[in-house]
């Protein structure tokens, strides 16, 4: 099956621009590019509550965000780990999506800003995520989350 014409045109323009491959760019340059994402300028969906906290991690305190769609207790929960190959992206990039997930799913979402490689090599980012999951389980009652209805998700 041939590619759609708009995809062919995009690939042609990208090739003509002679852009470096992701692995050829310093990580600081690549990260800076993710901080200019158009979604950061979008109007954010209304939500009942967004709470910013720091929780203890294995090697450092970890910033988390808690998105509550309602003031009800005993709601389902989702612990969300953002994509980026353990090296890029940050919570602000996901603000729009996480508000929507919480609202549409009628649940509480907890997302973590885990430490990134190469400054913090694997398994540090994974350990940060796992510590966040453990923290959520230990704090279900404070978070208003039903401990029998916790999911784990993310993107890559």
Q: Residue ranges of each PLM-predicted region?
A:
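A glycine/proline-hinged amphipathic helix-loop "lid/cap" segment
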Residues: 1-66
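Short glycine/serine/threonine/alanine-rich loop segments
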Residues: 19, 107, 145
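Short strand-loop-helix active-site module centered on a catalytic nucleophile
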Residues: 64, 79, 101, 122-156
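Short beta-strand element of the alpha/beta-hydrolase
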Residues: 74-84
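Structural signature of beta-strand start/N-cap positions in the alpha/beta core
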Residues: 77, 106-108, 149
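Conserved catalytic-core motifs of eukaryotic protein kinase domains, centered on the activation segment
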Residues: 90-92, 120-122
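Short amphipathic alpha-helix adjacent to the substrate-entry channel of hydrolases
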Residues: 91-111
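Short beta-to-alpha linker loops that shape the active-site pocket of alpha/beta-hydrolase fold enzymes
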Residues: 113-117
């Amino acid at each position: 099956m041939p590619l759609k014409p708009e995809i062919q045109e995009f690939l042609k323009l990208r090739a003509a621009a002679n852009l470096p491959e992701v692995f050829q760019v310093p990580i600081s340059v690549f990260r800076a590019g993710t901080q200019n994402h158009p979604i950061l300028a979008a109007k954010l969906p209304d939500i009942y509550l967004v709470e910013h906290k720091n929780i203890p991690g294995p090697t450092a305190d970890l910033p988390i965000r808690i998105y509550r769609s309602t003031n009800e207790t005993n709601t389902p929960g989702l612990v969300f780990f953002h994509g980026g190959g353990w090296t890029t992206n940050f919570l602000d990039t996901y603000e729009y999506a996480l508000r929507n997930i919480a609202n549409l799913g009628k649940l509480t979402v907890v997302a973590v800003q885990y430490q990134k490689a190469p400054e913090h090599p694997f398994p540090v980012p994974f350990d940060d995520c796992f510590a966040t999951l453990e923290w959520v389980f230990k704090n279900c009652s404070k978070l208003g989350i039903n401990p029998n209805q916790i999911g784990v998700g993310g993107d890559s």
